[in-house]
């Protein structure tokens, strides 16, 4: 069965979804005469004109509610219109887990638009909704911001939600730039990279984004030991529990560590560790993973806040 590519454009009302789709249709028609099936789940101030739809070879259907978004009906639309691609302008308030799609559809890209001018208010009050949206996104575009500075405090929280996504800042002319440019809060050029408690999330994310900064380096920080029968012999996870959204969303973020010092460690024990960093191929994750080889381990008291709370 030949799959039809689906481009999923998500986000809240008036965040720039329609403007982006119109620009995409306009640019694509210059290169090819592909037919587009446009499924609109939310109508804002910007509208699709009949002239645009006809000129760009686009058939549009508007869904008034999530109950109307029926996969059998969509399947009929596909059979009748025979599109080369499907573009979905999603309603950001809909529960995506309740949506079903015909088997012929294949979602190839999810782009989420967020109004940067109100992001801090909505993110602090609707964090679970943003979590759900961002987790499924390939690209996250912030609009209505002149510079990325207001986003800097949220960099770690957003990347912990989905570190595989590209976070972009898009201006009114649809020109894009990286959303995050803030300097690291620690010195990666130091002989020993010292990580403070508040900076652990930033460190964790950056080791994936910039492996070249850390490979062969030495790190020092306070961390929790996690033991498991599922780990290779004489290894442990050096990690921390982080709350990025709410109490139900607490997750462990850590790295595999070799117990090269043969320390008698206990599960959930806290240690002060200095360790060498290397990257080794992981068959489980099919990519290089950071591995720690301790130089020194000292037992310490557990911190007052065992869970690193990024919601504050």
Predicted regions and their residues:
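OB-fold and OB-like single-stranded nucleic-acid-recognition modules
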Residues: 12, 19, 34, 107-108, ...
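Nucleotide-state-sensitive switch-loop elements of NTP-binding domains
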Residues: 2-15, 19-120
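Nucleotide-sugar donor phosphate/pyrophosphate-binding loop at the beta->alpha transition
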Residues: 122-128
């Amino acid at each position: 069965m030949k799959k039809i590519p689906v481009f999923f454009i998500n986000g809240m009302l008036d965040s720039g979804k329609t403007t982006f789709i119109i620009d995409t249709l306009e640019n694509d028609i210059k290169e090819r005469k592909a037919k587009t099936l446009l499924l609109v789940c939310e109508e804002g101030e910007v509208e699709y004109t009949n002239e645009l739809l006809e000129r760009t070879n686009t058939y549009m259907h508007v869904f008034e509610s999530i109950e109307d978004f029926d996969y059998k009906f969509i399947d009929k639309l596909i059979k009748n219109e025979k599109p080369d691609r499907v573009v979905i302008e999603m309603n950001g308030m809909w529960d995506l887990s309740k949506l079903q799609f015909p088997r012929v559809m294949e979602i190839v890209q999810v782009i989420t638009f967020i109004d940067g001018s109100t992001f801090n208010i909505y993110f602090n009050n609707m964090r679970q909704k943003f979590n759900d949206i961002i987790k499924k996104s390939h690209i996250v575009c912030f609009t209505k911001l002149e510079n990325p500075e207001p986003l800097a405090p949220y960099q770690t929280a957003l990347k912990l939600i989905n570190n595989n996504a590209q976070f972009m800042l898009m201006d009114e002319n649809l020109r894009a730039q990286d959303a995050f440019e803030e300097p690291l809060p620690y010195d990666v050029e130091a002989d020993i990279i010292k990580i403070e408690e508040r900076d652990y999330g930033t460190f964790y994310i950056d080791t994936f984004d910039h492996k070249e900064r850390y490979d062969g380096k030495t790190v020092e920080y306070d961390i929790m030991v996690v033991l498991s029968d599922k780990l290779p012999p004489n290894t442990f996870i050096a990690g921390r529990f982080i709350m990025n959204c709410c109490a139900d969303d607490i997750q462990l973020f850590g790295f595999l560590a070799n117990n090269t010092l043969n320390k008698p460690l206990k599960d959930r024990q806290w240690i002060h560790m200095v360790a060498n960093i290397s990257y080794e191929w992981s068959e489980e994750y099919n990519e290089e993973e950071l591995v720690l080889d301790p130089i020194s381990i000292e037992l310490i008291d557990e911190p007052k806040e065992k869970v690193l709370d990024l919601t504050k």
